[in-house]
């Protein structure tokens, strides 16, 4: 009997060792069973990405799905935070908006490229005259943000867009900017953002109260193109990468990550290699261009009370110097 128990114990130890080697030694990370059905869109790699040490969880599915978003929120703690980094008091808004979307898939069903090489394209004026368009278009995944245009700037920033992050005040409203091959991702910071999306999808009159500037009054994208970003991604950017406090002093406005840092965080979860373009700012000349498009100058950046640009620049400097990412617009 004793020998039988010893054999069972040794078998258990061996099984644990094998599983440990499979799941961790090859960097194919453990994922919760509730998410398994959504994992087939992220091809595992045999080597760790350079930035692996920055993340507590790996291969996290970044988009909310109507069928299980509450389970995912409970699993990763988003049910313990209010917007913008959770959904504790806004779950019904999320449910209604998600019910009108057609998909929460990450990549196209025919996209089976493993270990994706991605570029996150910021909107910085440093992209002017860099002629990086062809280089940018060569990546497996191209992530853009807000209303940074491609049309008319193809030589500088390329033509293709895989993902574009937006919020109601920053989304395109002119149909000439719609690429049917682009997936657009709502980053919700307040319940009004979800209500706005729901009203647009239902064809209702848009309530513009509660926005810091007038949001788009029409939606140029089809429901199949739209996703809602899991607040966990934004929370990771704020607390894990930028190390923002969870409670700010009463005399300070809370700081939130810019869309650019959120986009980089998204890339960390879905890509094996991440390159950046357009994330360098010229603070020494406040008259220098803020974006690669338009006439805005760097002086506007200093007036923004809701972002900690200094913390973000230090974070970018750190991950670039440590070769966790590659900067295409480094002078």
UniProtKB/Swiss-Prot annotation:
EC annotation from Swiss-Prot or TrEMBL: 2.4.3.6
One GO location term (cellular component): Golgi membrane
Cross-referenced CDD domains: GT29_ST3GAL6 (cd23984)
Record keyword rRNA processing present: no
Lumenal side stretches: 26-331
Chain positions carrying an annotated carbohydrate: 129, 181, 282, 295, 308, 327
Cytoplasmic side, ranges: 1-4
Domain of life: Eukaryota
Membrane topology: Single-pass type II membrane protein
GO annotation terms (biological process): cellular response to interleukin-6; glycolipid biosynthetic process; keratan sulfate proteoglycan biosynthetic process; oligosaccharide biosynthetic process; protein glycosylation
Keywords (A to Z) from UniProt: Glycoprotein, Glycosyltransferase, Golgi apparatus, Membrane, Signal-anchor, Transferase, Transmembrane, Transmembrane helix
Principal subcellular localization: Golgi
Keyword Membrane: yes
Positions of transmembrane segments: 5-25
Compartment(s) of residence: Golgi apparatus membrane
Tissue note: Ubiquitous.
Main function: Transfers the sialyl residue from CMP-N-acetyl-beta-neuraminate to the terminal galactose residue on sugar chains of glycoproteins and glycolipids. It's alpha-2,3-sialyltransferase activity is specific toward type II glycan chains (Galbeta1-4GlcNAc) on glycoproteins and glycolipids such as neolactosides nLc4Cer and nLc6Cer, whose sialyl-products serve as precursors for the Lewis X antigen. Critically involved in the synthesis of functional selectin ligands needed for neutrophil recruitment during inflammation and lymphocyte homing to the lymph nodes.
Family, per entry: Belongs to the glycosyltransferase 29 family.
Protein name: Type 2 lactosamine alpha-2,3-sialyltransferase
Recorded name of the encoding gene: ST3GAL6
């Amino acid at each position: 009997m004793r020998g039988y128990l010893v054999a069972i114990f040794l078998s258990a130890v061996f099984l644990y060792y094998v599983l440990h080697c499979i799941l961790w030694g090859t960097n194919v990370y453990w994922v919760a069973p509730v998410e398994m059905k959504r994992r087939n869109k992220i091809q595992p790699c045999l080597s760790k990405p350079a930035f692996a040490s920055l993340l507590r969880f790996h291969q996290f599915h970044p988009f909310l799905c109507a069928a299980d978003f509450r389970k995912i929120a409970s699993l990763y703690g988003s049910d313990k935070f209010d917007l913008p980094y959770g959904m504790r008091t806004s779950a019904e808004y999320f449910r209604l908006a998600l019910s009108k979307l057609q998909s929460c898939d990450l990549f196209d069903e025919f996209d089976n490229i493993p270990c994706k090489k991605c570029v996150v394209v910021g909107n910085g004026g440093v992209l002017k005259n860099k002629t990086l368009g062809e280089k940018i278009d060569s990546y497996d995944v191209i992530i853009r943000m807000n209303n940074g245009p491609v049309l008319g700037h193809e030589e500088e920033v390329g033509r293709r867009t895989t993902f574009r992050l937006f919020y109601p005040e920053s989304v395109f409203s002119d149909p000439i900017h719609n690429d049917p091959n682009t997936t657009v991702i709502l980053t919700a910071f307040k319940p009004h953002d979800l209500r706005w999306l729901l009203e647009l999808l239902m064809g209702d009159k848009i309530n513009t109260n509660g926005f810091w500037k007038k949001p788009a009054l029409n939606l140029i994208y089809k429901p199949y193109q739209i996703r809602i970003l899991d607040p966990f991604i934004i929370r990771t950017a704020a607390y894990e990468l930028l190390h923002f406090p969870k409670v700010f002093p009463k005399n300070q406005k809370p700081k939130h990550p810019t869309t650019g840092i959120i986009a980089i965080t998204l890339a960390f979860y879905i890509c094996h290699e991440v390159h950046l373009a357009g994330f360098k700012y010229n603070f020494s000349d406040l008259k220098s261009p803020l974006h690669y498009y338009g006439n805005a100058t760097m002086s506007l950046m200093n007036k923004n009370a809701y972002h900690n640009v200094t913390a973000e620049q230090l974070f970018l400097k750190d991950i670039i110097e440590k070769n966790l990412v590659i900067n295409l617009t480094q002078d």
